[in-house]
Structures are given as structure tokens and as C-alpha cells.
Amino acid sequence: MKELDWANLPFGYMKTDYNVRIYYRNEQWGELEVCSEETIPMHMAATCLHYGQEAFEGLKAFRGKDGKVRIFRLEENAARLQSTCRGILMPELSTERFKEAILKVVKLNERFIPPYESGASLYIRPLLVGTGAQVRSEE
């Protein structure tokens, strides 16, 4: 495992050890899955590609002076994501499931949370993507 250079972190994507996924199938959200794969397989007629059906948020996890990890405005991010889902006709992920996913991915990737002295944070990008195949034209 390569040591991270906290003073020279890039601004942009950096692979972490894990991500978590929850799939919506048969009118319900499934179980939380831990994954290390960086790609998302999807159908060429996925609604995110044809209709832009996608929602995201951005959160930060900080390490406090006491060493404890804190996540900034977790509930507010869940509410905003739910609001976006309502606007684009996507199933909403409950606040409880959102928190479960964020807490799990932060714990799994804790080694990527910079030390307090750095003033930096781990950026988390929750993403909901419509991957179901659907292309329609109105007549």
C-alpha cells in the first residue's frame, strides 16, 4: 500500500479501496454491496444516457483534532438527493439507507481521510443513475 502525500493531493478523481452500491430492482432498494470495481455496467438504452436520469450529491469527511471522523451535513445531503429524485421521477433512497451507505464507504476508505493538520478532507460523491433500458417516443 502506497503512502499518501497529504501535502500534494490532486483535485480530482483518485481511486480509493472501495465503493458501495445499492440497486433498485422490482420496485425496491436492495442490500448494500461493497465493491472495488471502478466501472458501472449499463445497457445502451439506460435512462441516464437518453434522458439524463441521474442525481448526485457531494459530502466531505474530515478528521477532527481528536482523531474522530466527522461527515459534514449528512442529513441535508440526503434530503437534497431525495428532492432531486422527486424532480426527475427516480425512486428515492431513504435517509437511513443513504446514511448507511455513506458511513460504510467512509469506514471502508478511512485511510484516505487526511490528518487534521492537513486541513483537507475525503470528498464523497453519492450518485444515483438510471440504468434501466427505456427509450420511448410520443406519437
Question: Where are the regions that the model predicts?
Answer:
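Conserved alpha/beta cores of soluble small-molecule-handling proteins
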Residues: 1-138
